[in-house]
Amino acid sequence: MPLHNLTRFPRLEFIGAPTPLEYLPRFSDYLGREIFIKRDDVTPMAMGGNKLRKLEFLAADALREGADTLITAGAIQSNHVRQTAAVAAKLGLHCVALLENPIGTTAENYLTNGNRLLLDLFNTQIEMCDALTDPNAQLEELATRVEAQGFRPYVIPVGGSNALGALGYVESALEIAQQCEGAVNISSVVVASGSAGTHAGLAVGLEHLMPESELIGVTVSRSVADQLPKVVNLQQAIAKELELTASAEILLWDDYFAPGYGVPNDEGMEAVKLLARLEGILLDPVYTGKAMAGLIGGISQKRFKDEGPILFIHTGGAPALFAYHPHV
């Protein structure tokens, strides 16, 4: 078993049972292709989402180090920050979040609703900054201040996307392979590619478990030129942690993130509405809507390697729908 080293890393069991892997019959009929969906939007805590897989490893490491405070950063409507705050609440830890307003909006829904509303419910200490220009350095500076106040902070990077956190999606690849075995031969997998941990973890896991399946990352914030080194560097860091090789080519499409991170676009919003109306499943305007737009466009433009079944990784994000009203 090529991924046996995963068991060496401490991990908290937040998720428990595997998340569903479902066939989408009406959406498949609409697109003329078999489409499956991995429902990481329904992980158990705080309205679900993919970051919980990373936090199983990161929070375990925080407890191992004796931390009493989790510190992380993201946009005002960050799904990662929301899930980190929920984990902190569950574990009886303090949570400090460094937030930016990446789209420069004054819209009340964005500033106070959706994920931001949930941060208050989880009693998160909020620190605002003009921009996360160097988030690692900014988080370390914040940790120094928090430590000076007598706390024992543990820094979680943006998106939980370091080699340790990304192990959550190596684990997810194992789960996907087990669910597909004897049921469906997935030809292509599509995932939103942002802070890169989910994409890189899947890349390492699927290379060893489902090597015939191509993995497409649809970028949500950067061009291929900017995103590729982030994913590749993390892919190699994960492989080093697991003491295995990672040589799979990283495939990225950057046609769907414009005009920028956190700003809805027409293709993404069309995808959100389409899946809601055909399958009753909620995507979001920031990540999964744009990734699904990539899947839809990839089929119409014949960009996939063949016409076999496609698996979409639903990473969550539905709370942002309320923050982006009236765009939705």
From Swiss-Prot:
Domain of life where this protein originates: Bacteria
Keyword Transit peptide (UniProt): no
InterPro entries on file: ACCD_DCysDesulf (IPR027278), D-Cys_desShydrase (IPR005966), D_Cys_desulphydr_bac (IPR023702), TrpB-like_PALP (IPR001926), TrpB-like_PALP_sf (IPR036052)
EC identifiers of the protein: 4.4.1.15
Major enzyme class: lyase
Biological processes, Gene Ontology terms: D-amino acid metabolic process
GO molecular function terms attached to this record: D-cysteine desulfhydrase activity
Keywords recorded for this protein, A-Z: Lyase, Pyridoxal phosphate
Cofactor section: pyridoxal 5'-phosphate
Reaction equation(s) it catalyzes: D-cysteine + H2O = hydrogen sulfide + pyruvate + NH4(+) + H(+)
Modified residues (N6-(pyridoxal phosphate)lysine): 51
HAMAP family (UniProt xref): D_Cys_desulfhydr
Function: Catalyzes the alpha,beta-elimination reaction of D-cysteine and of several D-cysteine derivatives. It could be a defense mechanism against D-cysteine.
Oligomer status and interactors: Homodimer.
Family the entry assigns: Belongs to the ACC deaminase/D-cysteine desulfhydrase family.
The name this protein goes by in its record: D-cysteine desulfhydrase
Source organism of the structure: Escherichia coli O8 (strain IAI1)
